[in-house]
Amino acid sequence: MKANRKKLEIAMAKACMNTEDLQGKSGMPRPTVNNVISGRSVRPRTIGEVAKALGVDVTEIIETEN
């Protein structure tokens, strides 16, 4: 599962968070957060934890196929 980078950046901006803030709030290691932000494939649970930390529904930040 991948995060949509633009949607993720918008959610981070709305939450007034940078990468370090997201790392702290999600409790995930920096490389994992960087993988999510970079659009690399990660486990669904990881995307879920990021969405939870940002206070958004996971569907708002995932990459969807057209």
What are these model-derived regions, one by one?
Residues 27-42:
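Recognition helix of helix-turn-helix/homeodomain-like DNA-binding domains
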Residues 1-21, 25:
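A short, Lys/Arg-rich alpha-helix, primarily the initiator
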Residues 55-66:
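Short C-terminal boundary/hinge segments that cap the last helix of small helical domains
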Residues 39-52:
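Short, basic-rich loop-to-helix N-cap that marks the start of a DNA-contacting helix
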